[in-house]
Amino acid sequence: MSWRGRSTYYWPRPRRYVQPPEMIGPMRPEQFSDEVEPATPEEGEPATQRQDPAAAQEGEDEGASAGQGPKPEAHSQEQGHPQTGCECEDGPDGQEMDPPNPEEVKTPEE
């Protein structure tokens, strides 16, 4: 008897050659980080964006605080019931809302 079935062994596929990263070019850190670093200005460019943050805030605070008074305590009632982010809504009277009893619900007859 001779076996005429198809072979179950398959030759491995040839792998495609991929150049390693050092051959392609240098890896940039912004490709892999979530934070975006500000671009540093070159020597010939003036640094117009760089200012002392404390000096900038002082100028803003002087104009903003002149027309505003003390803030009212609007959150005093909310502090008694901290929300956890998983709060469920209760009914208008504070009791839990249960689904209606199917025996009590009247169905409209056709």
Curated annotation (Swiss-Prot):
Q: Where is the composition biased (Acidic residues)?
A: 32-45, 87-96
* UniProt cross-references to SMART domains, sorted A to Z: GAGE
**Tree of life domain:** Eukaryota
Which Pfam families does this entry report, sorted A to Z?
GAGE (PF05831)
* Similarity-based family: Belongs to the GAGE family.
**Additional note from the record:** This gene belongs to a multigene family expressed in a large variety of tumors whereas in normal tissues, expression is restricted to germ cells. These genes organized in clustered repeats, have a high degree of predicted sequence identity, but differ by scattered single nucleotide substitution. Their sequences contain either the antigenic peptide YYWPRPRRY or YRPRPRRY which is recognized by cytotoxic T-cells.
Q: What is this protein called?
A: G antigen 2E
Species assigned in the record: Homo sapiens
Gene, per the UniProt record? GAGE2E
